[in-house]
Amino acid sequence: MRIGYGYDVHGLVPGRKLVLGGVTIPYDRGLAGHSDADVLLHALADALLGAAALGDIGHYFPPGDPRYKDADSMLLLREVYRHVQTAGYRLANADATITAQEPRLAPYIDAMRERIAAALGVTKEQISVKATTTEGLGFTGRGEGISAQAVVLLLDREAGAGL
């Protein structure tokens, strides 16, 4: 068993789509970044890599590399999980929290869980996504950006289905 933690943050800017957990969310701004800047998937990717001691997302997808300009982070997450599986692990479960003052994310959480589960080839019950605010405090509270944190539990791939 191995545990990993990931964190990501991006600023909100006009003229970009807001993509979280692979779901496009209607909003007047989106997240700044080289790829689609999906903070939830980036935090999840870092948690997966960390649990397997495989480095971080920037090692695999350097922010200045033109191949990843506006890249779909769901594809990056799938690639990360292939590395994790090659290292001999499989996902037991993931738990993630998005911190954003706006927009309201509750209506999109189920779709995020479904997209992430499908990308990783696991059940929706293995993926938890929550959203919270900072009650107006800090950069997320002022609406300057969105952050996400994720924790994963990996099991040896050869281990039985139960924990």
Curated annotation (Swiss-Prot):
Binds 1 divalent metal cation per subunit. One of its GO terms (biological process) is terpenoid biosynthetic process. The record marks H34, T133 as: Transition state stabilizer. Disulfide bonds: none annotated. Belongs to the IspF family. Homotrimer. This is 2-C-methyl-D-erythritol 2,4-cyclodiphosphate synthase. It comes from Moorella thermoacetica (strain ATCC 39073 / JCM 9320). The gene is ispF.
